[in-house]
């Protein structure tokens, strides 16, 4: 069977990542087993692979290392790094003495994408989010007043807006590059000065000052793990491991 050639000049969406893992498992059946540690909040499988030479003993009887990536939605480089690690070990087994020794005597458990829902939203829309797509702590923020992110000009990006405010503006244009804003110093009176806002719209606008609407995605999966969890920690969720993505990892380990 021909060995898969994966691309590392792009970020894989969920279906592409799934196919890459399936292809690797099919191409190296003696070294790679594909499984799922559970499902995400939206029902996607959270894939993991077990890497070891099965001919030299069961994976569960060897010293092991655990690797995961993409706990936060935007950490797509982490998932691609984990995928590259899998690919590298498999491709170099039997060619590189150290890789061969590792897979003969050790086990690798690799979860490339802990949070497939958040990564998919991050990769396919202009929106930014910290972690999970589950609405929290509010069920619905659409009627709340204030500024909320939106792709106003339809270019596929949500950037920043500079609004002139010579009295209270905290930023000014860089003297080196007019595209860059630099912080205003405390004694700086040589404007113009600006305020920076996320590109977006203001719901129920009644003039300044206006508020910023809470994000619909307030969870931080990294703060949902049992270690050092606290009920008032920002983004920590309802209780330790309340989120399926975190519970999947906790139960697996």
Which residues does each predicted region cover?
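M14 metallocarboxypeptidase catalytic domain recognition
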Residues: 1-253
């Amino acid at each position: 069977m021909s060995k898969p050639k994966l691309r590392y000049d792009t970020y894989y969406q969920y279906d592409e990542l799934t196919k890459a893992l399936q292809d690797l498992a099919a191409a190296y059946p003696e070294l790679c087993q594909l499984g799922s540690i559970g499902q995400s909040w939206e029902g996607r499988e959270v894939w993991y692979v077990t890497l070891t030479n099965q001919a030299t003993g069961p994976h569960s009887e060897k010293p092991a290392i655990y690797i995961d990536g993409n706990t936060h939605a935007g950490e797509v480089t982490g998932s691609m790094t984990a995928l590259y690690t899998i690919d590298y070990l498999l491709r170099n087994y039997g060619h590189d003495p150290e890789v061969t020794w590792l897979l003969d005597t050790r086990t690798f458990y690799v979860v490339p994408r802990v949070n497939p829902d958040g990564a998919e939203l991050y990769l396919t829309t202009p929106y930014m989010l910290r972690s999970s797509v589950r609405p929290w702590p509010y069920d619905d923020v659409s009627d709340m007043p204030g500024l909320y992110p939106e792709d106003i000009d339809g270019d596929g990006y949500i950037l920043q807006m500079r609004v002139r405010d010579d009295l209270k503006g905290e930023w000014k244009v860089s003297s080196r590059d007019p595209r860059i804003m630099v912080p205003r110093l405390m004694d700086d009176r040589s404007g113009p000065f600006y305020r920076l806002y996320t590109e977006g719209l203001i719901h129920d606008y009644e003039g300044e000052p206006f508020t910023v609407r809470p994000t619909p995605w307030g969870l931080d999966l990294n703060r949902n793990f049992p270690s050092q969890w606290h009920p008032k920690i920002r983004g920590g969720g309802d209780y330790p491991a309340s989120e399926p993505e975190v519970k999947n990892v906790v139960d697996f380990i």
